[in-house]
Amino acid sequence: RRQRQMCIRDSYINVYVILNETTSWGKAGHTIAEEQFIIQTPATAAHASKSSGTITLAADKNWLRITADNFETVFNTDEARMILLRYHNSDIIYGHEGLTYNGYRYISNNKRDWKPTAFKVKDFSYQLAEDHSYVKVITKMEATIDNITVPYCVNYTIYANGTIDVDATFTTNDHFNLPRLALQMSLCQRLEQVEWYGRGPIENYWDRKDAAFLGIYSKTVSEMGENYGRPQSMGNRCDTRWLEMKDKAGSGIRFSGDVPFEFSALHYTDKDLFFARYGHDLGNFHRAETILNINAIQNGLGNASCGPGPLPQYLIQKNKEYNLKFRMEPIR
């Protein structure tokens, strides 16, 4: 197994039952059954980035620019959002669409009205370390979909070497009834190569993941989708230890977490998939950029296309705080 920096060292055994002779119903080598047994998932602790170099800040009433050697990021202070991330003069973020809340997921064939998300900035502040080795950026927001409001915070610790630790908190209340608590961002077109250590290679969800074994997998973003009779939110991967979004030369950005996370990487937003009526309509909605979602939690799928929903243990709970932590760092 390849070893990667910050990779959680899991131990597991894959067991396969395979035909050793051809029968009337299957050829030799056909897999009858398979199972993965998790032997060890050790607890890990976050490690601060050992960063050399110093950070320079420049601020205006509408933006905050953070620069260091071969690294630059910019925040729109009115929106409390990262709008630029650049490593070695190569952009990562597309269209100023940095991390922001996403609570939507469309997996129903029943047509409903689209409900846009309204954002309200509650606070934006920053603090530079005395030695200029890192800066903390603190944002507090509210996201409202229809009559449901979700307070959330996204805090960034940004180091001079380009490493960014993200710490997000989402709070639900009595009225909460959304399928997902996630951060979404748009990545530049060149970052088409996806590699991850987590469950795969097929899509998988909280209550539907046993058939997707833990392992290291790679696909293109275009290969991360599914062919459903009616387009819908798709392509989720659970229990992810690290995720790399790269160009053909192997440069890009790496996401990793001490606690495994879920992600999806598609050429469509949830809104695109909502309005695409049939599979052949997807070409009209295809985007050159990649829409990346990293989930704190999302509801399970359940087993009924209509009727009962997911079991209670696979639902986001009301009046609860959910946390999402991960690290972003450059790949060269």
Q: Which residues make up each language-model segment?
A:
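Terminal connector regions
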Residues: R9-H47
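Beta-strand/loop-rich accessory regions of lumenal/periplasmic or secreted enzymes
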Residues: F37-R332
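Contiguous N-terminal and early-domain "leader" segments and peripheral loops that mark the onset or edge
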Residues: R1-R2, G95
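Short, small-residue-biased leader/transition segments that mark boundaries at the very start
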Residues: Q3-I8
